[in-house]
A protein has these predicted regions:
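Conserved strand-to-helix beginnings and helix N-cap segments that scaffold or border functional pockets
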Residues: 21-25, 52-53, 112-116
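Short, conserved loop/helix-junction motifs that constitute active-site signature segments
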Residues: 33-35, 57-61, 95, 123-125
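Core AdoMet radical
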Residues: 2-22, 32-51, 62-89, 100-107, ...
Length: 131
């Protein structure tokens, strides 16, 4: 249940906001208005980075923030997972478009060093991250 108490609404799905159906988006718009939501969080794939502003405009005057499921800043590891984010994409590149990231850890062959490095980079470049 959305109360609007904090004025922040985090839309959690395991896909991209741009892939939500029209009925769901209309429902979110209605909740934003009715509950006086001033800040919305959505997840979106990096491939949608050039569509974020247009999508966010739909929910004005609320501020819309996006997080990206980048999984890791290790380019070779990320590439091996075939998530569609190129090896040359840096944390700074992602931060140009996204306010937060979702990191994946404890996969086969993972290391404490890699996880801690990803966390350090997330702290440096983003206002939000989840592991």
């Amino acid at each position: 249940m959305v109360t609007g108490k904090t004025g922040v609404l985090d839309i959690i799905n395991s896909g991209s906001a741009m892939e939500l159906d029209e009925q769901t988006l209309c429902m979110i718009e209605q909740v934003v208005k009715e509950k006086n939501i001033h800040t919305l969080w959505f997840e979106a794939h990096y491939m949608y980075r050039h569509k974020l502003q247009a999508f966010a405009a739909r929910f004005a005057p609320a501020t819309v923030k996006f997080r990206c499921g980048i999984e890791s800043f290790d380019p070779l590891l990320r590439s091996s997972w075939r998530k569609g984010v190129g090896e040359k994409v840096t944390p700074a590149d992602v931060a140009k478009y996204f306010h937060g990231v979702c990191l994946l850890c404890c996969t086969q062959g993972d290391s404490k060093v890699r996880i801690l490095n990803d966390i350090a980079l997330a702290k440096e470049h983003f206002e939000y991250f989840s592991v």
